[in-house]
């Protein structure tokens, strides 16, 4: 068994998150002309009851502050984006969330600013004489950009619209820490999600962590990290949590490829980092909707059962609880960030099987501490069935999932009780000789708890007639999308199994990992590490002066000094091709 370890704040470990991209959800204009504020944020007030109804107890919302476009090119950290309203609107919104016992986490875009930020505008005006010259990285008056400023500078992601802050400058650190203090005093925010945390300076993050401890008890810092060893960020000195992109990839590809080995192996890989409390998700404002990503829409159920029961903190991206679709476009993320009206989904918890499932899982998680704090133990694993336990204080909760089009029988070691009850179906099974024998329906999941541990529950209903009705209603209310979501059953019927019988494959235990995915993460197979590179890193060079190949080799050399370097470790290094991220990684070695 693997026990979880708590790193710093326990504030959000028990929570289930809801994630809102406000400029998209409110239908705000794509470009900010800095005109009079329009209080679009107030249109999100009715969403608060919905967030609570589906069992979410924390809200990550952002970006929120004044910017010129998508929100990540901040021009004023202390003013709500005028397309969303006024600071008073934001203060009232947070207060309304708190009234419903929902914590609020802001998006903190501290790696870079927009070109309209006061410090950058001062450099444009005063050039070499600007007192803010060292607020940004590598300002060079011998260069130029497409904006014809007469100087060049370091940007983020190749976009000169996003000007990289010099986070090692004490003035910048103090300014951003003051921003955090302002957000707490003005808006009573409960935490911050740090954008692009994988390229933030580690000393800068330590300063943010010290400020977090100062401003509010259990103030929570969560970072956006794509690749790497998450324990470099999640520890007692830097962040409380980071985005779990490794599990995100495994959850959809593990179902699309009928490969639960990938998911189970990813969980072990993450546990070996130190049993961190990671921010788990199946979609967000940067990646395709899970309903679009799944080859078999019926897998919506087992995917979300795993999201809510595996170690970590679960998050639902707005709209995905309704089963809406969203396909990533080549030059725009607008399709991932649609405007929605909550009135169009007024009865979703009662009528939409996707929403009903999410609401049930949220309630189950709230009433089952083992899902937040319990140790993790794998019980049974094939490529199509997976069972594990979460154990806490002598109580064993058992989770079963099945990605096959047929039902499956499982015999599993139980806890010290006489009977278990399925929290999603209400089905009861006796404990016999220390085991429970359960049948897991096709393309479904179940959470088994000792009878009496759940004070009340409402089994999820997925009658075909209701689903067809929801499909018709959803097609009407989401007509602006390129393809309306087919609200299909989330627990398979006998008719579905019979219709697909010819597609059923014999049970396999070999790896069937995805051949294509958004990113590379550990899977249950021998990892073919990249061939050894001929580049030899000069360790006397500063990390900033090394190129990507040199940084990779320097990191591997540092790893070798701490012990054997496995093929998986090499692959993790070679998968990271971002210069800033590699610089921070190399600096993190002591």
State where each predicted segment sits.
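Single conserved hydrophobic/aromatic residue that forms the stacking wall/gate
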Residues: 1-8, 13
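Ser/Thr/Gly/Pro-rich low-complexity, disordered linker/stalk segments of secreted
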Residues: 461-537
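Aromatic-lined carbohydrate-binding/catalytic grooves of carbohydrate-active enzymes
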Residues: 26-29, 50-92, 208
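Aromatic- and acidic-residue-enriched segments that line the glycan-binding/catalytic groove
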Residues: 37, 70-82, 110-149, 231, ...
């Amino acid at each position: 068994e693997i026990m979880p370890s708590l790193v710093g704040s326990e504030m959000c470990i028990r929570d289930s998150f809801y994630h809102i991209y406000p400029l998209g959800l409110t239908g705000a204009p794509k470009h900010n002309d800095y005109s009079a504020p329009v209080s679009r944020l107030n249109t999100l007030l009715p969403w608060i009851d919905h967030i609570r109804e589906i069992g979410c107890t924390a809200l990550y919302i952002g970006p929120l502050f004044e910017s010129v476009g998508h929100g990540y090119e901040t021009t004023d950290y202390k003013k709500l984006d005028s397309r969303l309203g006024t600071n008073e609107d934001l203060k009232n919104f947070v207060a309304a969330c708190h009234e419903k016992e929902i914590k609020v986490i802001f998006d903190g875009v501290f790696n870079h600013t927009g070109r309209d930020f006061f410090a950058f505008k001062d450099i444009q005006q005063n050039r070499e004489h600007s007192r803010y010259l060292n607020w940004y990285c590598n300002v060079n008056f011998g260069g130029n950009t497409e904006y014809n400023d007469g100087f060049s500078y370091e940007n983020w992601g190749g976009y000169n619209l996003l000007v990289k802050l010099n986070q090692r400058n004490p003035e910048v650190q103090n300014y951003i820490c003051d921003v955090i203090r302002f957000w707490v005093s003005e808006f009573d925010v409960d935490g911050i999600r740090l954008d692009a945390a994988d390229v933030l300076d580690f000393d800068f993050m330590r300063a943010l962590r010290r400020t977090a401890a100062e401003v509010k008890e259990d103030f929570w810092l969560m970072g956006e990290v794509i690749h790497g060893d998450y324990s470099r960020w999640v520890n007692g000195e830097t962040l409380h949590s980071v985005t779990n992109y490794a599990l995100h990839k495994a959850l959809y590809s593990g179902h699309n490829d009928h490969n639960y080995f990938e998911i189970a192996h990813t969980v072990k890989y993450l546990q070996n980092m130190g049993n961190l409390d990671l921010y788990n998700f199946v979609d967000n404002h940067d990646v395709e909707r899970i309903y679009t990503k799944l080859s078999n829409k019926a897998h919506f159920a087992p995917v979300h059962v795993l999201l809510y029961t595996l170690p970590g903190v679960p998050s639902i991206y707005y709209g995905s609880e309704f089963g809406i679709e969203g396909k990533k476009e080549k030059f725009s993320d607008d399709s991932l960030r649609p405007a929605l009206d909550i009135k169009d989904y007024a009865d979703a918890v009662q009528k939409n099987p996707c929403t009903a499932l999410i609401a049930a899982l949220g309630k189950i998680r709230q009433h089952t501490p083992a899902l937040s704090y319990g140790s993790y133990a794998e019980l049974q694993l094939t490529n199509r069935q997976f069972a594990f336990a979460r154990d806490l204080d002598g109580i064993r909760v058992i989770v079963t999932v099945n990605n096959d089009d047929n039902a499956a029988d499982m015999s599993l070691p139980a806890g010290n009780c006489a009977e278990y009850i399925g929290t999603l179906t209400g089905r009861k099974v006796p404990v016999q000789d220390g085991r429970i024998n359960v049948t897991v329906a096709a393309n479904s999941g179940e959470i088994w708890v000792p009878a009496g541990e759940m004070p009340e529950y409402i089994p999820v209903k997925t009658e075909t007639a209701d689903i067809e009705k929801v499909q018709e209603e959803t097609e009407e209310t989401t007509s602006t999308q390129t393809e309306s979501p087919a609200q299909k059953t989330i627990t398979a019927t006998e008719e579905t199994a019979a219709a697909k019988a010819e597609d059923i494959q014999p049970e396999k235990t070999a790896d069937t990992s995805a051949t294509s995915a958004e990113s590379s993460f550990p899977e249950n197979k021998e990892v073919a590490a990249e061939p050894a590179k001929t580049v030899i890193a000069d360790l006397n060079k500063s990390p900033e002066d090394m190129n990507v190949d040199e940084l990779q080799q320097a990191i591997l050399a540092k790893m070798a000094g701490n012990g054997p370097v496995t093929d998986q470790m090499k692959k993790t290094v070679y998968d990271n091709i971002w210069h800033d991220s590699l610089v921070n990684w190399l600096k993190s070695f002591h």
